[in-house]
Amino acid sequence: MSQQLQQIIDNTWENRAELSPKAASAEIREAVAHAIEQLDRGALRVAEKIDGAWTVHQWLKKAVLLSFRLEDNAPMPAGGYSQFYDKVPSKFANYTAEDFAAGGFRVVPPAIARRGSFIAKNVVLMPSYTNIGAYVDEGTMVDTWATVGSCAQIGKNVHLSGGVGIGGVLEPLQANPVIIEDNCFIGARSEVVEGVIVEENSVISMGVYLGQSTKIYDRETGEVTYGRIPAGSVVVAGNLPAKDGTHSLYCAVIVKKVDAKTRAKVGLNELLRGD
């Protein structure tokens, strides 16, 4: 079924300029709707780890983008306090008490998750925003004013602190989604964008900004890398001096690496403050 679905989505994508709410076959509508429904249930996901490496399913990103071409904007009531006007309804618009109980997660007002995002059991959504295509795995906390961007992949037992921004990457299509692996802590007001991968058991301090062009400096080795935080890293904001010594530019600094056992035993403040 997935292969047939992928073929329809890929073929439709090649002719997307001709697509509109009034110019789409029933087959296309059903294929896109089914893909979004599978993302919403967590049966499919935009990226998954296969044999130790992350694989991005670009056709599912195409399905998300095509869904915007198939719908007109429409009024969406918001419990009497406001009204919205958009193409994508809330994930929870038609949820019953039984649906919430089966989902096993908490949604604190006024948290918003768009249809097509997946929220796993024991997740807590504080007043936050989770966009279409995102996958939030079990036991994760999305704290107040945090944003989980389109198609971002958040692992198990992750803590996204207040005001954290996890970037969404639907366009350009070839770009990969942001991935935060299991048991990571992302400090308040930090930003992770442009397909950066934060590997498991890492701690990102408050106010760290990570994009593909951000230099990641390993204090122990002196190595500078881009786009990936190695497993078990403790990262703080820093600066690197220019070669001519006239100025310095922002970077992220890996101050130490810890294993899962140490990460579990030692408090976050101690990890971040220790030399």
Swiss-Prot record:
Classification via Pfam families: Hexapep_2, THDPS_N_2
GO cellular component, one term: cytoplasm
Catalytic activity: (S)-2,3,4,5-tetrahydrodipicolinate + succinyl-CoA + H2O = (S)-2-succinylamino-6-oxoheptanedioate + CoA
Main location group: cytoplasm
One Gene Ontology MF term: 2,3,4,5-tetrahydropyridine-2,6-dicarboxylate N-succinyltransferase activity
GO biological process terms, semicolon-separated: diaminopimelate biosynthetic process; lysine biosynthetic process via diaminopimelate
Protein family: Belongs to the transferase hexapeptide repeat family.
Subunit structure: Homotrimer.
Name the UniProt record assigns to this protein: 2,3,4,5-tetrahydropyridine-2,6-dicarboxylate N-succinyltransferase
